[in-house]
Amino acid sequence: MKNYDIYKMKHAGLTNGQVLNVLRYAENKEKELSLRDIAVVSECRNPALFMERYKQIDDDFLKKSFEEFPSFSILDEIYPWDLSEIYNPPALLFYQGNIDLLELPKVAVVGSRDSSKLGNQSVQKIIKELNNELIIVSGLARGIDTAAHMAALQNGGRTIAVIGTGLDVFYPKANKKLQSYIGKNHLVLSEYGPGEQPLKFHFPERNRIIAGLCRGVIVAEAKMRSGSLITCERAMEEGRDVFAIPGSILDGKSDGCHHLIQEGA
């Protein structure tokens, strides 16, 4: 099954998990799957609706969108082994930049969008101390993510940004130059096709990729019940090392980090 076929199935309404169901089934079958086969084995809620949407797709138009950026799928050799081992690994990823960075050792950095000066400085110091031995992976959000990417660049290191939009969408807009620079000189990844906007549920989905690419996750200024805390707890369940940076006990910004430290991070 080709990468475009995966993109088309998702465009017709299948979730990532449902696409994975199809790929696993197809792997064990020598014959090409019919549309009805795909609808059934995907376990989608409304097979008839999926098939109708699939048939209505304008292939010429969709292929133009698909070909705007290079991509790789879970079926390709370049797909990172660590990422393939997580729960619900992305079936398809679009990218800009140096794909070879995926083969190098990486550490993720996550944390608050509303970070403090102390939080940013803590991340900058740790990344400097790593001495460019690891690729810094983060989500290009405001706050800790931006501090992590910038620290990697300022110290002559390399960085990977995993974003929650299409590669042609800049969110936040303040990071447009940074995203463009990383895409040209380092690597930007997304499981969302061109034009896809920053929907709320995209960001926890993005976070699983950030953690999944790496054997370790550094977290700074995570509040309780924050997305960063959930990402770290999931990373721990996946067997990743989590390194929580302690912060002030006065403002609640690092309560999630302190919880992780109590749990053994």
Q: Each PLM stretch: what is its role?
A:
Residues N3, I74-A265:
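Glycine-biased, small-residue-rich flexible motifs in mid-sequence functional cores and linkers
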Residues M1-K128:
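Short, positively charged patches
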